[in-house]
Amino acid sequence: QTMNNYIVKPLGDMYLEDVTADDIRLAMIPLASKSAGLYSKVNMLLKCVFYSAERSQLLEYNPCEGLSAKGGKPGKKINALTDEQVKLLLDTVRGLPPYTFIMIALYSGLRREEILGLQWDCVCLDVPTPYISVRRAWRSENNRPVISTTLKTKAARRDIPIPKCLTDCLREVKEKTESEYVVADRNGNPLSSSQFQRVWKYVTVRSTKPHNYYKYVNGQCVKCTVTPTPGSHQKNNPKLVYAIDFDVTPHQLRHTYITNLLYAGVDPKTVQYLAGHENSKTTMDIYAQVKYNKPEQLLSVVNAAFAPSAGA
């Protein structure tokens, strides 16, 4: 998908030898507003294509020479949810479509594509140590779900022991479904991209963040904004309570799982395996945030490091 959107579309109709450095720079312009990770990925793919062509003597000139590896917007810092926020989130969506997805993300740390591709043959509940095997991944093509055994990385293939709260939740879900997918639509099929967005909307509509809506005034469409107060009800749907007064995203649930493991003292190498991180740097960056983000706990260490020597 990345290759199609950012390389094939702008450059796909050209011959390799006709591509200039200006063409490459023009192709990279839309990526300036995207994440630094996506920019780096496209940058790497382009360089792989043209350096390979150069080595095969298909090109006399490599248009990627001098292409900066830095670009895109730096990623926003992701904060793990607190225990209180986790409880509030689960209480708010209990019995609603996103509940199972949220439970799996919070208590097994699976990525979104791993949860949406999860089938019951990879959920082992009736064993002494219940666990989930990650063997498939979901992706969307033209808003159609595609389930593949090709995972994000080799490290993504893993077996994750799950706690009792998630085991009980999955047992209950399994008893009520005939689908082979753990998270499925009403027909038992894996969710499409738009279906998942609708499922997640059950979370966002219960947020106390300002909501925009439109209404007609004197024949004109006017944009209005309402800022709900926690505990208030939606005017047109009294059953809907605005309760979530914090930001929450699907990836944040996985980040919370990893953070909680580190807070519990699980060694980073084990966390790396459970999270499916191929690069230990990803795990260690989170570890550093967890270990070194409380100045009061570091005060004694800093004081000891800079204490005057006995002979001074």
Range-by-range predicted roles:
Residues 80, 138, 167, 275-300:
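Catalytic-site neighborhood detector that most strongly recognizes the C-terminal catalytic loop/helix
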Residues 127-128, 140-157, 164-166, 187, ...:
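C-terminal secondary-structure termini that scaffold catalytic or DNA-interacting sites
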Residues 36-44, 55-120, 126-128, 155-157, ...:
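Basic, Lys/Arg- and aromatic-enriched nucleic-acid-binding interface segment
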Residues 68-69, 85, 118-175:
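Conserved tyrosine-mediated DNA breakage-rejoining catalytic core shared by Y-recombinases
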Residues 36, 87, 91-96, 108, ...:
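Short, basic (Lys/Arg/His-rich) helix/loop patches that form interaction surfaces
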Residues 17-22, 51-73, 224-232, 300:
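Short, charged hinge/linker segments at domain and secondary-structure junctions
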Residues 1-60, 75-77, 189-195, 212-214, ...:
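N-terminal core-binding DNA-recognition domain of tyrosine site-specific recombinases/integrases
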Residues 122-131, 247, 266-286:
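Short, polar N-cap/turn motifs at the start of nucleic acid-interacting alpha helices
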